[in-house]
Structure formats: structure tokens, C-alpha cells
């Protein structure tokens, strides 16, 4: 039996020797490689924080002490040592262990994360609650250098520093080299700054100098300047010191002893402390060390070779979007592309290679990305800002106030719209229709397939004013990509087939599910109209009303929440016209959606052929069809 199998709770780590900890770190890395190679997941970030996580759980007392993981994708080690080893093989699977901290999973997951830059704000909140309740415990936020680019992180640092909140921020820096500054001088300065005698003597000397008649005040100022000069020379964390934090580090994030020592030092300080830890992303697995970006978030792979397992499939919507944008940018030098730290994930890496001067990666700063794009538009450019649906939530005010209200010519590409699979509820893009369709002058489209996506992108760049374009994470339908691009009439749906008995309205790829269901309905003697809505705003009210009056029964199908979604929009149209004799069944989500394969999630919520047939049965169009049809 290995050491890992004996670790049931963090307290079991405290009695281990350092050689045993080294062996445990190897076992943890092997377990993570084994599971992630089968399930996919965030491998490189977790390989880089093994020693850091062990040190945190040896020095601090979770769950009494609060450890908050920013983003949360680097919490696998934390899960393994907090009683979840037996469930670890279910990581990111349907009904399995989440890839992010979940309060319902363990008391050691004190705060749920998934989006970046939130941990320091949460830590300030926990610390203030502790102080108000007169409790005694430590609060630690662990944040990566990437997440530190988010403005919210600095808002929280400013608050914590200003209020002198007793808390610890661990900056996990996997971009900076473990170099000479991790040495004697750094260790000496760390000890000096955490020694209470240093603070006392500093004040005493300053007061003594000020008492010297005539020149005392000037001498004190000179000493202060000399101290500041030394800090500029020797202290890498001056920015954090100026914000009110005691800075400790940088520390080798793979040196178990050094990590534990610096955390013990941090516990001595009764004001905000930032511990700067240098780690190697992907450590301990050669393919990941060589290509940490690939293994940041990776699908199933061959753990021996590190090769990602790919099945033959059509290109993804993201790939088609990126290639189409490059094609259009070749002909129009005004087209620019903006992303918030997701060049590969949004398909803009190709644009970045071809047009580096017109490509902008602004970091994890969605708010800035959107407002920056608005000003680019007013400056005469044609910006296309591509952000995942779930992250557009963070920039809603900028979309409304800076883009739409002044009618800026900005194309907002909404990637990962709909459920995204294994990353679960923090990453599903199932709210964008609700919060965007209410904006009066925003043209809002959704393509049924990858070819229509190309035409919609082309159309977007011809329009005057803001445009949003939503498309899913998945592969395309495998349709032919037509070479000549054309404008699609704004606000006009596509009627794919007409039938007198029922109307199926789909948005995005759900249109193909509607078409497949229409075939099954025809086999049962029911003729269905199938509408590809195309435009969520403005709606094709004319077509909706025409077929509502004709069939009297409508089923709407959307990869989105029901509340405020496309189905709600259709019902609003019917209500405005007083069509009380038309019955509508809406298919979509009415709760937070769990993690799992996209197809499995769709089936579970009725976004399938069977789901549509059952909805038709509820509308009394069909006799019972249970068990008589396959998805």
C-alpha cells in the first residue's frame, strides 16, 4: 500500500517525514496523470501545485482554516488529500467528482470557484466574518499569476490592504523562473519583515531621529528614502507592499521545507501577507513540462506518449469561426480581434499569427476587452471580441453601457454557448440569450451549423451597430462550407419545411434535432413545420405568428435556460397578439446543469428526438411514444 492510500484527511499529512512527502508527491502525480488521461481535465496546473498543496495542508488546519482556490482548476491535489480518493476516478464525469471546488462535496471546499480572480475577495469576506464573530482561524487565498491579471483581484487587494485585514494571499507564479532571488537575501528579508522586533526598532529609530534639534526631521526623511531605495533594489513585491501587504518570497514552490517555513512565517503576521511562490506548470510529466499550454485543459490522452486521443470529426465551430475571421481580415484591414486570455480556446490563435498587429489578448479582463473594443470601433476599426458565454456575464455592464447604448460597431462572438460538458455549471453558457436579447439595438444571431456561422460572421461585419453571435463548443454538423459568403436578411428566420400539425422552432444546432424529430413525427402521421430562428433579436415575428396560427401547437428547443430564453421570446410574441388558443411546450433548462458529456446532458433535459416526441405527446399531437423511438 502506498502512502496516498493512507491519507484520509489533511491531518494525516502532518506526521509524514520529508522523504515520505516526496514519495507521496510522486504518487499524487501518478494518480492525476492516470485519471486525467482517461477523463480529460486540467493536468498541468495541478502537477505544478503538488508540494504547495501539501505544505498548505500541513501548516494550516483545514477546514477550520479557510483555503480558497482561485479558478479552482488546480484543486485536484486538494481533493485527493481531503477524503475524496475513492471518488477521484469519477473526476469530471456525469454525477462524479467536480473538477472545481464544490461546497456540497466537502467541508474543505469552503468557497466554490470556476471563474478567475475571485479568491482574494472571498478571503477578505471570510476574514471579516471571522473577526466579527471573534473567532481564531487563518484565511488563505491561492491565486495564479494569470488570475492576478483580473481587475477584481486588485480591487480585493486594495480593500484588504486598506483595512489591514489579517489574511494570507499565496501567489502561485508559474511563469517566473526559479532564479537567484530565491536565496539567502530573500530568506533574510522575509525573516526581517516578519520579526516584530524589526517593526518596533524601526519606529523607535524614526522617533529618536526626529527628536534631534534642527535636523532630526530631515534625517528621518533621509533614512526613510534610504529604506525605500533598498526596497526597490531588493524587494520584488514592492507593488504589494505599497498596497499594504507584507511580501514574502519568492519561494521555490517545489521545496517542501521552504514552503512550510514561509507559511509559518506568514502566520506570525497579523496583517495582510502575500507569499510569492514560484512553480513549474506540468512538473513531473515530461509531455506536460514541454507543452504546459496543451495540458492546461486537455482531453483524454495516451499517458505513455502524451498524445491527445482524437477521433475523426468535422471541424469545431470555434475552428470555423477563427478561419473565417482570418479570411475576412485578409480583405479588410479594419478587422481586429480581441480575446481575454483565450487565444487558442476562441480560435483566434490563427488570427494572432497572421495579423499580430491587429490582435489583442488583454488578459483575464473581460470588462476591459469589451470597452476597449467599443473604442476601437469608434476609432474606425471593426473589432470582433471573442469571449466564452459564461465569461461574458462578467462584462454585461460594458456590453450594455459602452457598446450597445452608444451603438458601437462591435461584433461579440459568444463561444461555448450552451452546455459545455465536463467543466460543469460554472462554465455552461446557458444565460446569454436571457441577458442579451433584452437589449433593443443588439442584433443577436445563432447559426444552425458551421456553414451558417461563416455567413453570419460575414453579415455581422456588414452591419451598422452592435452584433452578438452565439455558437457552441462542439464539432460542427459536417456540412459543406460554401466558398462565397452572403448576407443573411436581418430578423428573418429560415423555414426548413412546412407542416400543418405542429411547429418546431430551434435555435442554433438544436435545429438539426428538430429536423430529426420531424422525420420521426412524419412516420407517425404528423406533419411538422421546422423553423431555424437564426435571429434571436430582432425576432421574425411574422413567421412565428403565421405558423402559430396555422398549427396551433409549438415546441421551442434551445440549449439554454427556459427563463428569459428563446421560448419565452416566442411566447411574448404570441401574448402580444392575444393568441390564447396556441399551446407552447418549451424545451431547455430550468436549473443549474451538472457536468457530463454534452449529448448526455441534452438527453437528460429533453433536448433530443425523444424529448421532442414526448413534448408532442403532451400537446396531444401523438399517442404515447414511450419506448418506441431511439434518440
From Swiss-Prot:
Which residues are involved in binding thiamine diphosphate?
A: 73, 114-116, 146-147, 174, 285, 366
Relate the protein's function as given in its record.
Catalyzes the acyloin condensation reaction between C atoms 2 and 3 of pyruvate and glyceraldehyde 3-phosphate to yield 1-deoxy-D-xylulose-5-phosphate (DXP).
Which residues does Mg(2+) bind?
145, 174
Query: Which family does the UniProt entry place this protein in?
Result: Belongs to the transketolase family. DXPS subfamily.
Which GO BP terms, alphabetically?
1-deoxy-D-xylulose 5-phosphate biosynthetic process; isopentenyl diphosphate biosynthetic process, methylerythritol 4-phosphate pathway; terpenoid biosynthetic process; thiamine biosynthetic process
Q: How is the cofactor bound?
A: Binds 1 Mg(2+) ion per subunit. Binds 1 thiamine pyrophosphate per subunit.
Which SMART domains does this one have? Transket_pyr
PROSITE patterns under this entry?
TRANSKETOLASE_1, TRANSKETOLASE_2
Can you name this protein? Answer: 1-deoxy-D-xylulose-5-phosphate synthase
Q: Which InterPro entries match?
A: Dxylulose-5-P_synthase (IPR005477), THDP-binding (IPR029061), Transketo_C/PFOR_II (IPR009014), Transketolase-like_Pyr-bd (IPR005475), Transketolase_BS (IPR020826), Transketolase_C (IPR033248), Transketolase_CS (IPR049557)
Cofactor(s) needed by this chain: Mg(2+); thiamine diphosphate
Pathway listed for it? Metabolic intermediate biosynthesis; 1-deoxy-D-xylulose 5-phosphate biosynthesis; 1-deoxy-D-xylulose 5-phosphate from D-glyceraldehyde 3-phosphate and pyruvate: step 1/1
Q: Please report a single Pfam family linked to this protein.
A: DXP_synthase_N
